[in-house]
Amino acid sequence: MASLSTITQPSLVHIPGESVLHHVPSTCSFPWKPTINTKRIICSPARNSSEVSAEAETEGGSSTAVDEAPKESPSLISALNVERALRGLPITDVDHYGRLGIFRNCSYDQVTIGYKERVKELKEQGLDEEQLKTKMDLIKESYTILSTVEERRMYDWSLARSEKAERYVWPFEVDIMEPSREEPPPQEPEDVGPTRILGYFIGAWLVLGVALSVAFNR
């Protein structure tokens, strides 16, 4: 009875990974075993330093390649630019022909020639690297627009509409038609034999008709 009158006190049981207060009566008639929560930790196989460095170099190389990728020039073909051209408003204030030093109705070959000449002039000016890159980007932008059929058509159409807003111009009216560089196929000589025979036959019938008409009138 003395054991029953004893006041039970909570005891602190230490469990690996956790600390939990368990109320363990001191008058238990059976042996008490603390429960231990076990946790499984899955460890990935160790990799050597060469694999880690190779992976780091791959990631670094891909990011560098993305950063160094050339930026494409913005396209002039958009719904907003089409709407502005229809209203007779300019879609850009850049004179792409003036940048390359060429005329509006020049051929595509002349666009390439003008681009190469402008690049040569810029390199001979002795500009620093940053200024040269800035001007080269502008030259490349103009060359890309004027050397692409769809982009140049949109640009020329906008120029034609903004110059004469009261007169509507179709986009294909401003296309630069490239002259054919192929020689035309040789023409076959026309066979005039059947035509000549037909003419002789009709002439003979006319002569015969006149002769018969004169004979019957006598």
Curated annotation (Swiss-Prot):
Residues 47-72 are annotated as: Disordered. The keyword Manganese does not apply. It catalyses: a plastoquinone + NADH + (n+1) H(+)(in) = a plastoquinol + NAD(+) + n H(+)(out); a plastoquinone + NADPH + (n+1) H(+)(in) = a plastoquinol + NADP(+) + n H(+)(out). It is found in: Plastid, Chloroplast thylakoid membrane. Disruption phenotype: Malfunction of the NDH complex. GO terms for cellular component: chloroplast; chloroplast thylakoid membrane; NAD(P)H dehydrogenase complex (plastoquinone); plastid. The keyword Glycoprotein does not apply. Its EC number is 7.1.1.-. It is a single-pass membrane protein. InterPro entries: J_dom_sf (IPR036869), NdhU_chloroplastic (IPR044199). Residues 95-159 form the J domain. Keywords: Chloroplast, Membrane, NAD, NADP, Plastid, Plastoquinone, Quinone, Thylakoid, Transit peptide, Translocase, Transmembrane, Transmembrane helix, Transport. The chain crosses the membrane at residues 197-217. Its main location: plastid. One of its GO terms (molecular function) is quinone binding. Residues 1-53 form a transit peptide. It is an enzyme of class 7 (translocase). It comes from the Eukaryota. Part of the chloroplast NDH complex, composed of a mixture of chloroplast and nucleus encoded subunits. Component of the electron donor-binding subcomplex, at least composed of NDHS, NDHT and NDHU. NDH shuttles electrons from NAD(P)H:plastoquinone, via FMN and iron-sulfur (Fe-S) centers, to quinones in the photosynthetic chain and possibly in a chloroplast respiratory chain. The immediate electron acceptor for the enzyme in this species is believed to be plastoquinone. Couples the redox reaction to proton translocation, and thus conserves the redox energy in a proton gradient. This is NAD(P)H-quinone oxidoreductase subunit U, chloroplastic. It comes from Arabidopsis thaliana (Mouse-ear cress). The lineage of its organism: Eukaryota, Viridiplantae, Streptophyta, Embryophyta, Tracheophyta. The gene is ndhU.
